[in-house]
């Protein structure tokens, strides 16, 4: 195997729920990788996206509920690092000052639905609350 006894750095665009990263790290471990380090080319996704991405609630987002160390433990990586929000903005804002960063910082380009749920932007959405 090309990865046996090697230190591997995996570069990915994002971690949303963590399930894909967990599978990837496990595959590399099974192939004999000595270390697996993840580097993510976006900031941590901690807020739901209501603009077409399938993340309805913060509870679905691993970075919204777990620390970097907890995520490392869950996915089995030796280390994890994200691009900072400031780093992302420095790369994009000069050309695209209206770039949406809501999933990273919670600053939505429109009023947030209440309760926070992706379906809230559908024309016939009726919010429901659990009073238990």
How would you label these PLM feature ranges?
Residues 1-132:
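PRPP-associated nucleotide enzymes
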